[in-house]
Amino acid sequence: LGKVGAKKYMLYVMDYGAPIGFRIAAKHPERVQGLIIQNGNAYDEGLRDFWNPIKAYWADKSAKNAKALSDSLLTIGATEWQYTNGTRNKAVISPDNWIIDQSKLDRPGNQAIQLEMFYSYGTNPALYPEWQAYFRKHQPPTLLVWGKGDYIFPEEGAHHYKRDLKNLEFHILDTGHFALEEDGDLISDLILQFMKTNS
C-alpha cells in the first residue's frame, strides 16, 4: 500500500486475508476509512472444530500431524467441500472453482507451502486482543457479511464483532464459506452502498 501511495483506504478482508488486513489496520488506523469483513475471524470463539487438527499442528509440527492435514484438507474432495458445504444449492456452484484451485494446489512443492500457511496462521490468535482493542478504540465503519453455513469460520465468530464495533452493518446470509458464490450480487450491492455512505 505504501508503494502505490495509498493514504486512505477501505479494507475488504476474508479468510486468510482477514489477519493481514487487521494487522494493517491496527498499525495504521488513521488510514482506514472502513472495514468490509466476509467470513474473516478475529476472535477465539470463531475457531471451532474445523481448527482442531490445525491447532494440533501448531502445538506439534510433526510429520504425523502434517500428514493428517494433507490427507484431510488438501485433496480435491476437501477443496470442493469448502465451496459447497453450507450452501443453499450446491448445484449452482461451478465445479470450475475447485478444479482450478486444486490444479494449483497440486503443483510440485505447493503442499509444503500450504502446510506452512496452516502453521503460520497460528500466529494470529495471540493478536486477537490487539485487533479487538483497535476496533474498540477507533470504531471504523464496518460492513460484515457472513455465510451462516461456514464450518471453517462459523457464525459464532461473526457475532463477537458486535461486542467491539458500534458502527457495524451486520448481515448473516444463508450460504457457506465462499459467500460470493451464491450471494455475489447482494454482497456487491451492500459493498457499493457502504462505500458510498462512508467514503
Regions found by a protein language model. Name each.
Residues 191, 195-199:
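Short, hydrophobic alpha-helical segments
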Residues 1-12, 16-172, 186, 192-193:
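Flexible "cap/lid" subdomain of the alpha/beta-hydrolase fold that forms the substrate-access gate
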Residues 175-188:
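Catalytic histidine-centered segment of alpha/beta-hydrolase-like enzymes
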